[in-house]
């Protein structure tokens, strides 16, 4: 099959979170199964690996009521069957830092930026004579793709393509004032609540994807069920229940080449199931990197976007009580100012027990996964989550709240590979930490937990085959 994959970020070129990881890994998994895959994404100003980009000799010209937009299509060949294409436009992407916003908030023209991506990706496929069987859009930034496919490309070479829309996080919906309908030349008959883009008198890009796509997926089976409830449906649960027969929960995989303790260039010592001794070396190096003394105390780590969703406020609430025990806590992340400040204040208050790095540091993130004994993920909700799977691969026991993809990947109980807690409450998290301390006091049992986690297969191969089966079913309809 020919698969066109459209995403607002693609690792390693651009990334703010899990979407970038998926957009980098799933197309590669599909290509390895023998499919021809092209990924289309913006050419941002701060693109990593920009030196790899080559001109295709083709360019876009899109006409909107606010003006004409044009720009070249650039290419980075990843493998024989996988190519990443970049849509360049100085006015929308090249004139600013950041993907979606800056310190002042979301960019005011995001509706224009991602309309250009959505429509431009389809035009780019035509210009490059790539005729997809499947067009796979992701999150609100590409929600207009299936709309454009039905309303602007319903004749011609893309007419028979099937559309798939993946919800990576339902909370982010891309809502804009209704006057963007005119700004983007969207037909007003689409501004309806039942089967259109209208949502509480706004234009909702995510809803557009949910309504107009041939199939919907989300990133774990549990999350697919959760988003059909009023508690986690963010106002779209009724629509999702209506389209439940088209909704599939497919668990994300992880990049097993990048995240492999047996061959991780970021680690001072490698290790695996047959020999875990290198993990102790990583623990010593981790403590040294944070200026903490080596010793017998267990190390609890986290690598996270510092956000309400991730439960970092709950962690801040619980840690002072947890630090009465002889433990170490180290973390890497950035995000909401009050959470950053709270973690730095905690580090100042407990300088011998807490180490915090504010910012994105891939090497340090790998070292936390390898060197920590336990990994903290107290998420309010978690569509899939990746770090708990990294932790399991690295023999680091995850402590997670029982929600979303965390339920689908972490096994609790005496014969499990992790520790789960139900209630989003300080007492529940502290109880989970106490269970971790009891586990740490029993080295043979801790070793069993580690090994059970390391034996799990979270490769993209399994996820890729699930998507492949879905794509085949769609094409056969």
Swiss-Prot record:
CDD domains referenced in this protein's UniProt entry, alphabetically: GT5_Glycogen_synthase_DULL1-like
GO biological process annotations for this chain's record?
glycogen biosynthetic process
Q: Where does ADP-alpha-D-glucose bind?
A: 15
User: Which terms in the GO cellular component ontology are assigned?
Assistant: cytosol
Give the matching InterPro entries: Glyco_trans_1 (IPR001296), GS/SS (IPR011835), Starch_synth_cat_dom (IPR013534)
Top enzyme category: transferase
Q: Name one GO molecular function term.
A: alpha-1,4-glucan glucosyltransferase (UDP-glucose donor) activity
Q: Which reaction is the catalytic activity of this chain?
A: [(1->4)-alpha-D-glucosyl](n) + ADP-alpha-D-glucose = [(1->4)-alpha-D-glucosyl](n+1) + ADP + H(+)
Carries keyword Glycosyltransferase? Answer: yes
Give the record's keywords alphabetically.
Answer: Glycogen biosynthesis, Glycosyltransferase, Transferase
Q: Cite the EC number.
A: 2.4.1.21
Which pathway does it take part in?
Glycan biosynthesis; glycogen biosynthesis
- HAMAP family (alphabetical): Glycogen_synth
Q: What does this protein do?
A: Synthesizes alpha-1,4-glucan chains using ADP-glucose.
Q: Which family does it belong to?
A: Belongs to the glycosyltransferase 1 family. Bacterial/plant glycogen synthase subfamily.
Which NCBIfam families did the record assign? Answer: glgA, PRK00654.1-2
Q: Under which name does UniProt file this protein?
A: Glycogen synthase
* Species this protein is from: Myxococcus xanthus (strain DK1622)
What is the gene called? glgA
């Amino acid at each position: 099959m020919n698969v066109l994959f459209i995403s607002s970020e693609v690792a390693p070129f651009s990334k703010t979170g899990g979407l970038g990881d998926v957009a980098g890994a799933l197309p590669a998994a599909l290509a390895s199964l023998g499919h021809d895959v092209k990924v289309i994404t913006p050419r941002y100003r701060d693109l990593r690996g920009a030196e790899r980009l080559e001109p295709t000799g083709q360019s876009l010209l899109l006409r909107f009521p606010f003006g004409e937009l044009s720009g070249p299509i650039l290419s980075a060949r990843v493998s024989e069957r996988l190519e990443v294409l970049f849509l360049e436009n100085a006015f929308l992407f090249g004139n600013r830092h950041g993907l979606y916003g800056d310190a002042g908030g979301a960019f005011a023209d995001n509706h224009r930026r991602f309309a250009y991506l959505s429509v431009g990706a389809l035009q780019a496929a035509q210009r490059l004579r790539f005729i997809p069987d499947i067009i796979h859009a992701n999150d609100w930034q590409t929600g207009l793709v299936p709309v454009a496919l039905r309303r602007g490309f319903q004749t011609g070479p893309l007419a028979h393509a099937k559309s798939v829309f993946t919800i990576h996080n339902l909370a982010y919906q891309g809502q804009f004032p209704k006057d963007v309908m005119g700004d983007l030349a969207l037909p007003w008959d689409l501004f309806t609540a039942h089967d259109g883009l209208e949502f509480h008198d706004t234009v909702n890009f995510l809803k557009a994807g949910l309504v107009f796509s041939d199939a919907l997926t989300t990133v774990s089976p549990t999350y697919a069920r959760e988003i059909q409830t009023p508690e986690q449906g963010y106002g779209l649960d009724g629509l999702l229940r209506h389209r439940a027969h088209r909704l599939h929960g497919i668990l994300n995989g992880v990049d097993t080449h990048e995240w492999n303790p047996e061959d991780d260039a970021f680690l001072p010592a490698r290790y695996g199931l047959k020999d875990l001794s290198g993990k102790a070396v990583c623990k010593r190096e981790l403590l040294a990197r944070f200026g903490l003394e080596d010793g017998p105390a267990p190390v609890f780590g986290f690598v996270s976007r510092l956000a309400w969703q991730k439960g970092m406020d709950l962690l801040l609430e619980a840690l002072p009580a947890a630090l009465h025990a002889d433990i170490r806590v180290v973390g890497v992340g950035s995000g909401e100012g009050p959470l950053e400040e709270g973690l730095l204040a905690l580090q100042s208050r407990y300088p011998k027990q807490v180490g915090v790095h504010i910012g994105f540091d891939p090497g340090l993130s790998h070292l936390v996964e390898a060197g920590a004994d336990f990994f903290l993920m107290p998420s309010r909700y978690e569509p899939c989550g990746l770090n708990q799977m990294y932790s399991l691969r690295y023999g680091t026991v995850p402590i997670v709240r029982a929600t979303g993809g965390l339920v689908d990947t972490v096994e609790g109980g005496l014969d499990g590979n992790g520790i789960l807690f139900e209630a989003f409450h300080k007492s529940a998290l502290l109880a989970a930490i106490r269970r971790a301390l009891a586990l740490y006091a029993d080295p043979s049992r801790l070793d069993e937990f580690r090994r059970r986690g390391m034996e799990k297969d979270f490769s993209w191969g399994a996820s890729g085959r699930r998507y492949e089966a879905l794509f085949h079913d769609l094409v056969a309809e």
